[in-house]
């Protein structure tokens, strides 16, 4: 097992714990943190929350084929062996825009399920930053965020280079690992502790100001920090002069050809929770994965941004070491030449540029991911690089 894999597994063992109704309760010995009721709600998505705001399906849906035998393909023995019904709920494998295998834990989900994604939303936020750069709203990632966002001025996030916000290295707080990505107890109490109930009421900028320790100049140390992502959303809004969700809908969701709409959690003041809470159908996550791979391969502004986004920009501190991190994107991800979007409990969109293999996972335990990663490597080995 390589160092990156070990570090990501360490991340899983610690888990990105989200507290629901004031408690985090282990429900089994497979690493699930949170009640079965929490995960039942999570599997249904968060669009029912009164503070969720929707994005529409794309006017032009991109191609995604579904093999006729995808529920019982030649990969069934391999996937079934890796799939743990105690913690795994959906696994979808797709090769170059063709879904080759699907598996659903029918106790909890079905083909119509639209689970939430937790911190996978962070990676979506980075994609929006890339589009803002390529549209000319932002000149480059080596400028300070305060050049574009007056509300971030005087904070660590405003002083930080945009590159460093993307790499989770704002320097705002002491680099001490937080399993939730909340740098202070107040941030935890006012965001994740309330987000899954639709009860976030605190204005995010004032919360950031209170949490800002101005620990170090940006770029010195990676720290998984939800507020770095939130700063990026404000940056996009202020640079483009549009609501983040409107810009994201047009530049990412419609551009990649989503077949269904999605929704994103907001606070009661209408500020997007950029760090968590995007809900969509798994097929559209798969479409997004292929879109990222295809755009990354192009010699365009966005292609260059994606290449940077998927190369090491920082080392994010973990309980037992650190992990390579790009622009709001995890690197390594269990082998091959992969990078991935990760969320609490094992939500995952995994992509391999050399093979074109994309995997979507909805689960309740990140620490139980090892079998799925081994399966992914085995499937990837069937495709020439």
Regions found by a protein language model. Give the residues of each.
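Short, charged, amphipathic alpha-helices and their helix-cap/turn boundaries
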Residues: 98-103, 146, 181-218, 242-261
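Active-site-proximal alpha-helical segments within enzyme catalytic domains
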Residues: 228-235, 274-298, 347-363
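Active-site SXXK
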Residues: 97, 115-141, 165, 232-236, ...
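Structured C-terminal helix/loop/strand segments within mature extracytoplasmic catalytic/sensor domains
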Residues: 22-34, 340-385
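Active-site helix/loop module of the DD-peptidase/beta-lactamase fold
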Residues: 135-177, 214, 238-280
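Active-site Gly/Thr loop motif
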Residues: 259-262, 307-358
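N-terminal leader/targeting segments and the immediately adjacent pre-domain N-terminus
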Residues: 4-13, 19-110, 134-138, 167, ...
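Extended ligand-binding groove/face enriched in aromatic
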Residues: 116, 152-208
């Amino acid at each position: 097992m390589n160092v990156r894999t070990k570090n990501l597994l360490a991340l899983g063992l610690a888990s990105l714990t989200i507290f629901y109704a004031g408690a985090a309760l282990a429900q089994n010995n497979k690493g699930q943190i949170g009640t079965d009721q929490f995960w039942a709600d999570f599997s249904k998505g968060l669009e029912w929350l009164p503070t969720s705001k929707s994005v529409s399906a794309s006017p032009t849906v991109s191609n995604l084929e579904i093999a006729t035998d995808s529920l019982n393909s030649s990969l069934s023995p391999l996937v079934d062996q890796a799939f743990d019904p105690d913690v795994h709920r959906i696994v979808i494998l797709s090769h170059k825009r063709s879904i080759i295998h699907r598996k659903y834990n029918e106790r909890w989900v079905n083909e119509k399920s639209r689970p939430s994604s937790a911190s996978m939303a962070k990676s979506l936020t980075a994609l929006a930053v890339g589009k803002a750069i390529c549209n000319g709203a932002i000149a480059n990632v080596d400028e300070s965020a305060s050049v574009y966002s007056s509300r971030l001025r005087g904070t660590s996030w405003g002083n930080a280079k945009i590159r460093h916000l993307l790499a989770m290295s704002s320097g705002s707080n002491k680099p001490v690992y937080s399993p939730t990505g909340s740098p202070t107890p107040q941030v935890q109490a006012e965001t994740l502790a309330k987000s899954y109930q639709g009860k976030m009421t605190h204005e995010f900028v004032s919360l950031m100001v209170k949490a800002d320790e101005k620990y170090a100049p940006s770029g010195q140390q990676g720290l998984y920090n939800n507020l770095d992502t939130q700063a990026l959303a404000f940056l996009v809004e202020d640079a483009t002069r549009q609501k983040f969700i409107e810009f994201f809908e047009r530049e990412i969701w419609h551009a990649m050809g989503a077949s269904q709409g999605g929704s994103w959690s907001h606070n009661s003041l209408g500020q997007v929770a950029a760090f968590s809470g995007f809900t969509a159908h798994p097929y559209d996550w798969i479409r997004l994965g292929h879109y990222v791979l295809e755009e990354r391969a192009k010699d365009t502004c966005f292609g260059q941004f994606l290449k940077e986004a998927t190369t090491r920009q920082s080392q994010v501190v973990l309980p037992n070491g650190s992990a390579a991190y790009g622009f709001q994107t995890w690197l390594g991800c269990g082998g091959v030449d992969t990078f991935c979007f990760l969320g609490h409990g094992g939500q995952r969109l995994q992509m391999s540029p050399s093979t074109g293999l994309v995997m979507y996972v909805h689960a309740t335990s990140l620490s139980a991911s090892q079998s799925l990663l081994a399966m992914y490597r085995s499937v990837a080995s069937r495709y020439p690089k």
